[in-house]
UniProtKB/Swiss-Prot annotation:
Residues 119-356 form the Phosphagen kinase C-terminal domain. Residues 9-91 form the Phosphagen kinase N-terminal domain. It comes from Penaeus monodon. This is Arginine kinase. The modification N-acetylalanine is found at residue 2. It catalyses: L-arginine + ATP = N(omega)-phospho-L-arginine + ADP + H(+). GO terms for cellular component: extracellular space. SUPFAM superfamilies: Glutamine synthetase/guanido kinase, Guanido kinase N-terminal domain. L-arginine binds at residues 64-68, 225, 271, 314. Its EC number is 2.7.3.3. ATP binds at residues 122-126, 185, 229, 280-284, 309-314.
Amino acid sequence: MADAAVIEKLEAGFKKLEAATDCKSLLKKYLSKAVFDQLKEKKTSLGATLLDVIQSGVENLDSGVGIYAPDAEAYTLFSPLFDPIIEDYHVGFKQTDKHPNKDFGDVNTFVNVDPEGKYVISTRVRCGRSMEGYPFNPCLTEAQYKEMEAKVSSTLSSLEGELKGTYYPLTGMSKEVQQKLIDDHFLFKEGDRFLQAANACRYWPAGRGIYHNDNKTFLVWVNEEDHLRIISMQMGGDLGQVFRRLTSAVNEIEKRIPFSHHDRLGFLTFCPTNLGTTVRASVHIKLPKLAANREKLEEVAGKYNLQVRGTRGEHTEAEGGIYDISNKRRMGLTEFQAVKEMQDGILELIKMEKEM
């Protein structure tokens, strides 16, 4: 059971949320007094409490979602709060639904969406994974961070062929290596205020690192927001090549490292927005004519469940008319379906741009 000091902090946090009339987070929407009272004394076997789940959203009242899972068990123990938030965010994934088993499908279905190279600047597909038997960031010890890093770096160093590369630990990284990784846009920084408030950045930079292959088309982030972020990317629009590279990497890593998986929710991640397939397939794309008609762009994107962001990701503007467009859905469909939906949408957007 959670101790008195934690419960006191929780009570204060709940009062703060209640008083914040302009707060629009899903946490505020679904943390009723009844749910709060039901969960405030609970504790996972690794010692995580409701405070670990909600503290980022309490501190940052402008959060969109406002909760994180401190460990895998939290998704079950605190399900009266997680489930409605998951259903709301992953539109259409009801509390009775079950996420399908992993299925990359026939990877040869995927093509170069822009063979002429006129519109798509680059293509990227990523997924997140958590290592079984370890909690998520807020509950990890420094020793666990280092142990996980050792397991992951030895697994990655055994990769061959196109995936063969080098692991760069953040600890003790030289200025030259650091600058090189910044220039390649590979380096991740210590978490933003949302992650900081969730206690996701403790013992930084212990156990954190970056692996990339020699061609710089395959990248793994170790212990950033998630235990593993596996990323495949390249210039141009060859989604087929990018997706095939990602799937072969995931399959290789999976042989050596068991991943956290939930019967109903799919692959588990620190943030509930990434659950399920955890897959985000995106392009940086120039659509000058459609961009001039943002409503039309959003309408078509909506039809294919695509998310339109600015060039530098969330909360940014489109620089030089270049957008970051990706699949929105992660849950209740397979990896294959998620990427196929994105491919269909991008092909449709390019077709419209040509016809305008």
